[in-house]
């Protein structure tokens, strides 16, 4: 009887030990963000972006120019956002891991902890601040018009001169909201991404895209039939400070990550940002 009891006790202890190991493995697997370690032993900085929003970010087939492999993909990500992300990761002694996420999924991915940060050309609006925190700006993006070079809109000297245009922009952006400032505008439904916006303009579905300078400049650089139209400050699109400040979205209360990133960004000037952006515009795939 004693032997049977000891045998059963051994089986019980073995089962309990296995169960504890499973739980421990599950807890370890659930640790995300900066706690994750790469094969190198470094922490991993998980950054989300669309990888389809040149010149801020795009996808390419190789690591040419310093592109970073997209997690779970054979593609690589590059662009202004990746250049900034690499600087941040290097300063933090972390390995950079890029996650390709649709625009509408970026903030939720930050909130859930799927990624540590969204570096994706995101304006620091009050609405977004309800769900995420933002770092100091890593770019300042003036709102402009993107039109066909041979269109009447190309001669506009003010937003008022765009009267009666057929316009659209990207979904859930401040650009789409700015369209309402154009007199008698015909506002089409918003488009999911920047490539879709360009197609709509080139195909004649619309004759005006409202966007920011980097996006318009990159589109015109890659498409000779398009041009960017800028306006004097008193005749341009009326925007708030938060509309033009582009920040990095991080989880609310993550002061450690915010401080680490802000330390790097505070050491950079607007001229530094513009220099990196110009480099990104020249390197975008369609610019070659």
Predicted regions and their residues:
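Short, low-complexity disordered leader/linker segments with a strong preference
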Residues: 1-44, 288
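Extracytoplasmic small-molecule ligand-binding "clamshell" domains
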Residues: 42-121
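Periplasmic-binding protein-like
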Residues: 52, 140-147, 222-262, 285-288
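Extended ligand-binding regions for polar small-molecule ligands
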Residues: 82-91, 151, 164-165, 173, ...
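Acidic, polar ligand-binding/catalytic clefts
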Residues: 95-161, 239-241
